[in-house]
Amino acid sequence: MLVERQALEELHEVNNHQEELGGSGYSSRETPNRQIQMNKKERRKYSSLRSFTWSENQEKSEGQLLVENTVQEWYNAKHATSSVSEIEFINSLDIKQCPFCGSHDFTKYGHKKDGTQRYICKGCGKRFTALTNTIFDSKKIPISEWIEYLLHLFEFHSINSTAYDNRNSPTTGKYWLIKTFEVLKGIQDNVVLDGTVYLDETYFAKTKSKLATKDGKKLRGISRNKIGVGVGVACNETKSIFIVTGTSKPSRKSTKETYSKHIARGSILVHDDEHSHSILIEELELESKVYSTRETKGLSDKDNPLYPVNNLHLLLKQFIRSHGAYDREHLQDWLNLFWFIMNDPKDKYDKVLKFIEMAVLSPKRVRYRDAMSSKHSK
């Protein structure tokens, strides 16, 4: 009963902590001072899971030893050192150049204690490994821990619940999320939809503190309190795009900037009666198939010609809701993550492997102090 009570108290603390944070990801309510205060609270509230009331006792009962050893096993499972297979994976990476000066003239230079291959650059004289200047540089937690973290992200788990499941602090979850965003920056830049393209916009509300009002009431409908998110889907359902338009009401200019490089010339455009889409039809010589809201209202999914894009709207909003306190200024980062989840490869383990390969081959080191500074926590 004591163990069950402690577990319930810990769960209650986590729920209270999540309410204080208002969700996961970048919180628009966090200032540098508040971030420091919250970190102090986290240190007080998140006491070590290996701390027991009998820890100082020289003699322990069989029951106490059972609980203590079980918790230690949990901790070890969640905080393992780098495995042999992980070291072999790191050492198998094909290093092309020095991560510091870009020189191709480097040579092997022994190994680290864990067996990781070290190199030395003949140009600048600096030593490095295959992970230098990547998001895994100076890692304290094995890369293998990322597998479970990414699987949770892909399944729409909140960052706080993922951190708790993995026995990590909430700040670790946020830090890793920022690293994830960094790897995925620009991932949609070269996506081009062809064939039959379904296109429609969806909208997200601004934070309450930034809502414009009239006579003390929120503006109705599509107003400047919304952030436009343009979405296009290919008919073969193999590709999609999720791009912030930056406008509350589409214009010919914003529509061109959002979609023009992502739709192949001569494609078939299936859309609603939004007037701004006309610039795409004109400049990309698209065949237009228009279905007004009045025509599609009340239709079942199977009968609605805009279902492919409407379904993505639904999934996107479900994903965003699972991260309620996301910072609207970083909405494109969230859309890049959602794009990665929704597009090939479909298998979740293939997706995890693809991300890890992208990360180790990307010179994008993210330092903790920079990542958790005011520019990210606003």
Role assignments for model-derived ranges:
Residues L2-K378:
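Residue-level recognition of single "structural anchor" positions
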